[in-house]
């Protein structure tokens, strides 16, 4: 009631419990918290950025995207990132660690609570913030399971999307476990030399391996895949690139 539905993280505010019970909770349990450090609102593209400070003083960012009375939350899964993608701002940060399940959940809870105060609610969640979600696989999946739980907020798994740079072993595991969670792939080129330049992870998991894993995913789950493709002048946006992309898909 208090944690998941009312999103209250101070035992003292659990008003339907006796003072004695609240004191017992405080002695036996610890509730992690985030601290708002910054909140930026952009009227131009209807986005809001939330900068949170964790218990160890590290910072993470979540982005709220509004569109036609629907709200999508872009959450982080790691502090920094190991992959060094050429077009990503997180690549400029040092990788520090994976986020805990609680730290992923709190991004959702804090922003959902913020929206409820305006009589709004989150529609979708995308793991497209800081970090590679499939390099924090267990915690990402567990956080989704908890939000999906009937004991939690009972959010449909279809409302979640995990975006990956192409971690092939994790895609295979994701396929075998048959999650009803949407999958997105950061692609940006279907030429190995170009994609490796943009995304060094392609050297470890080249396009042939990635495509094989994705084809198997579609065959087994019957789910659609979203492909992300940033147009970069003189690199991946010629007419031939479009035809090559169509052939790959």
Regions found by a protein language model. Give the residues of each.
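Flexible, acidic/Gly-rich N-terminal and inter-domain linker regions that tether
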Residues: 1-71
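Short linear Ser/Thr-Pro motifs
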Residues: 42, 76-77, 163, 186
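Residues in well-ordered beta-strands of folded domains
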Residues: 51-53, 63, 76, 126, ...
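Canonical Radical SAM [4Fe-4S] cluster-binding loop centered on the CxxxCxxC motif
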Residues: 66-112
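Conserved AdoMet/S-adenosylmethionine-binding subsite of the radical SAM
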Residues: 112-124, 129-249
């Amino acid at each position: 009631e208090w944690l998941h539905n009312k999103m209250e993280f101070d035992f003292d505010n659990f008003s339907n419990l006796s003072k004695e019970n609240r004191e017992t909770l405080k002695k036996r349990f610890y509730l992690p918290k985030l601290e708002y450090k910054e909140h930026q609102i952009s009227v131009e593209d209807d986005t809001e950025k939330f900068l949170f400070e964790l218990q160890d003083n590290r910072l993470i960012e979540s982005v709220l995207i509004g569109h036609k009375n629907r709200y999508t939350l872009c959450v982080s899964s790691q502090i920094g990132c190991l992959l060094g993608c050429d077009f990503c701002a997180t690549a400029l940060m040092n990788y520090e660690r994976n986020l805990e399940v609680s730290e992923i959940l709190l991004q959702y809870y804090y922003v959902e609570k913020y929206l409820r105060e305006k009589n709004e609610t989150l529609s979708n969640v995308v793991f497209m913030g800081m970090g590679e979600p499939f390099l924090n696989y267990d915690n990402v999946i567990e956080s989704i399971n908890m939000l999906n739980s009937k004991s939690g907020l009972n959010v449909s798994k279809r409302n979640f999307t995990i975006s990956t740079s192409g971690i092939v072993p994790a895609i295979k595991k994701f396929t075998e476990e048959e999650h009803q969670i949407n999958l997105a792939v950061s692609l940006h080129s279907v030429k190995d030399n170009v994609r490796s330049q943009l995304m060094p992870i392609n050297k470890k998991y080249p396009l042939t391996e990635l495509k094989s894993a994705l084809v198997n995913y579609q065959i087994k789950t019957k789910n659609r895949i979203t492909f992300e493709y940033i147009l970069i002048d003189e690199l991946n946006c010629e007419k031939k690139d479009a035809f090559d992309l169509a052939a790959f898909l």
